[in-house]
């Protein structure tokens, strides 16, 4: 399907990104991927020359086997990376939970932070269903324990981030 989409090249811009996204959506639709965790963009970018050569060989020589080998190698490599990241995230979560064992409100915030690593005091109020001072206390505890880092530099409306989560999933927090 990806090769066919690339061959049609229906848009002036964005065909590559959309074609790679279609891979993930197709696998989800077919029940082969329960969550959108497999993105081949990094693999394709790292093997760009092979990618284009193999796409061209499908068009010129009908070399589907070469294309499929490349594609399966990419799925394998990215899948192993995703499993490694998931393992590291579970280890990080357990390490943090151990440090907060006797702090139920902070533990509840921690669970939320592993769904979305950004937190504000207002969000903590909603998540915990507590007053502003109680929410602030839970956020400050996570900050003192080195789990949250304030990223705005503001006095009011501060936003906090769990940078170790972002580092683990290899995303840059705070535009860095």
Placement of each model-derived feature along the sequence:
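Alpha-helix C-caps/helix-loop-beta hinges
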Residues: 8, 116, 145-146
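Short alpha-helical segments that sit at the start of domains
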Residues: 82-110
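Conserved, hydrophobic alpha-helical core segments of structured domains
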Residues: 101-109, 115, 132, 156
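Basic amphipathic alpha-helical segments that dock to polyanions
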Residues: 113, 135-145
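Short acidic, hydrophobic short linear motifs in intrinsically disordered regions
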Residues: 110, 115-128
């Amino acid at each position: 399907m990806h090769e066919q989409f690339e061959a049609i090249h229906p848009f002036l811009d964005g065909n590559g990104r959309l074609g790679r996204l279609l891979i993930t959506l197709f696998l989800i639709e077919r029940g082969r991927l329960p969550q959108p965790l497999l993105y081949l963009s990094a693999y394709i970018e790292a093997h760009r020359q092979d990618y284009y050569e193999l796409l061209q060989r499908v068009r010129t020589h009908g070399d589907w086997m070469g294309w499929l080998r490349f594609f399966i190698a990419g799925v394998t490599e990215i899948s192993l990376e995703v499993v490694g990241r998931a393992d590291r995230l579970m280890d990080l979560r357990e390490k943090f939970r151990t440090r907060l064992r006797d702090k139920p409100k902070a533990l509840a915030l921690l669970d939320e932070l592993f769904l979305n690593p950004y937190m504000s005091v207002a969000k903590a109020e909603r998540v915990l269903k507590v007053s502003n001072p109680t929410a602030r206390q839970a956020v400050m505890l996570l900050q003192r324990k080195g789990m949250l880092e304030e990223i705005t530099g503001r006095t009011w409306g501060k936003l906090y981030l769990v940078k170790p989560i972002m580092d683990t999933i290899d995303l840059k927090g705070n535009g860095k």
